[in-house]
């Protein structure tokens, strides 16, 4: 068994010649005596009709190289930026017919039905590519640098393979990150969060990329150290972000952008906590903030979407004013900046940010404060943070629209901290406390929608209709009353970390 740790970098197929020369130059800079091979690799990937290997996050292939055949199973692992880490097992075979019983029995999870899966294995797709391979000396080991050029084939469809992999084989992981930076800058390479197998499943129509818009509670445990809890939260945020980035790259849409925004927001919240623990995060929080500026258009888009949604509270009334409704719909489309976001995702700065987040998660720097148990620290953090939120929301009898909007970022930040540490507490008590505050946050965001409507009506003679103006005012007053009711009810809830 080997524990695979490799950095995957995607390049544009048109860069193949430049990539080949860049890899040669890198290899020569490491060693004057080149250890180089060129291999033609044919790979067939297998799963059951109901994709049970995929459900276990496993990948099974048989690879042909010259007259040699090798069967490989990759077990569940993780992706940090473009760094892939997962256990891998290999056995030689005599034919292109998979046999799971050739692997040692103790590699499988306890609930893994080896023989049932074996009976139903079928080929799903193939990959054929030329592998250019260099071995680079590094510390007490080496790094395998490979350039793969070829294609994935499934159901008559093809997709180009053009990627560079840097696999650590006992060397210094910092060398991999330094090389990754060089490749990003010279070849406009991007972090590869999807493996060849994952892309093959997509091409074969056996998998789909759907945005994850809602973040869930991070799976932290009371017995973990604070370091384990914070780095796990950061890893979860990065995974959520990168999944949605892959969705954006596959088919640019607003839901993918919203999912990215949620993941980035979570990552930044965790980085700020690490910074308070005196962990050197090397400006990562500020760099994340710069990425967030490319997502600020989502606030206006979501406000317009609230007004035009067919199942929303305002759709029926606004539909009566066809010109206004069409203008709202047009504005909703005009505010979208997906093209600019995709350009940002492909930029050097963005890719180097992902690389540095991956570097932080692999290194996991420690401080004395990070060694404490996470539960008591999380309880104190949530209590102190919430005390500030509570004081702000309880300061007067009635809050204005402007005051609610000003308090929204603080409320959202506090709810996000709850996402990081909520699993440490009783689910029913936790959800009972959070629910009215989440409703309040949604209601405050609705104020933005009504402000947009007010602005558009006010600035246009075409829609200066007295009935519409009065209707708007009624909606704003009704929303404010609902917010006041929710706020006062929420303030009476007992915090779940005190129960």
Segments the model singles out, each with a brief description of its role:
Residues 1-499:
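Function-determining surface determinants
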